[in-house]
């Protein structure tokens, strides 16, 4: 048991294979050239910049999986999808799905929110609007920005990716 737990706690340090979030092998040679060192460096400038970049988002998701806390980004992404829904019936269905998966106290991927926020969100979702999840989404975003994001920037995943893009750019310019 101790050995297993030791492996789990070291998991985020042992990840150097970025194949999880890079394109399939046949597409890497052309697509990964688009991932510049400047782009990867900018991810450290702000959480918004990281999330707005598809490779940055994928790298962050991979990192959160190594920390067993990917429910936060998955919830945030589900909320982003929810905001795009126009049909009231589809909105109600998606709201219920999000509530059951992330917000309910018995949710399989429960996000860490306070009781008041949980109850207010539950009440807002009785008659969902495109903005019903804004408050809880903002709280989860803030939690990731203040907690997970700084750890990601210091992580081996990010540092290795930064180093790989530096090496690639140096080789390319020679």
Swiss-Prot record:
PROSITE patterns named among the record's database cross-references: RGS
Its keywords, alphabetically, are: Cell membrane, Cell projection, GTPase activation, Membrane, Nucleus, Signal transduction inhibitor
Superkingdom of origin: Eukaryota
Q: Does this UniProt record's set of keywords contain Membrane? A: yes
GO biological process, any: regulation of dopamine receptor signaling pathway
Q: Name one GO cellular component term.
A: neuronal cell body membrane
Record-annotated RGS domain positions = 46-162
The name on file for this protein is Regulator of G-protein signaling 8
Q: Which organism is it from?
A: Danio rerio (Zebrafish)
Gene symbol here is rgs8
